[in-house]
Amino acid sequence: TFIDHAKPHCTSRELYKGILSGKARAVFNGKIVVRLDAQKTDAMQTNKNLLLSEEGRVDTKPELEIFANDVKCKHGATVGQLDKEALFYLRSRGIPERESRRLLIQAFANQALAGLPIESIREGVTELLLARLVGN
């Protein structure tokens, strides 16, 4: 991804989420540039990844290139697996493992999916995502 701030008072929020299963590989290479004239820019770049297997791999490289001196910019990246304690908690409440995994995967994806403005599309994408990933 590439975001180029060239004028003052720009704002950007980039959220890029990945969910990997099996032997999947993913690369995130995102860059935000804040030009000299783009004073008062407020930019945030976030990459979050969820690995559903031991074989999956994510390479993530968020970048900020800032030429202005009066800005508020940040970036970050995370790679993790399903929270075993959360999975245990759900299981201890009688929720089957498959449903527990589905709930945790959906919770992870919801932040990105919430940005889809048409509800029927959002629901369809959510169902496709869960159908593909829950059995892994």
PLM feature spans:
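Active-site gating/interface segments in enzymes
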Residues: 1-136
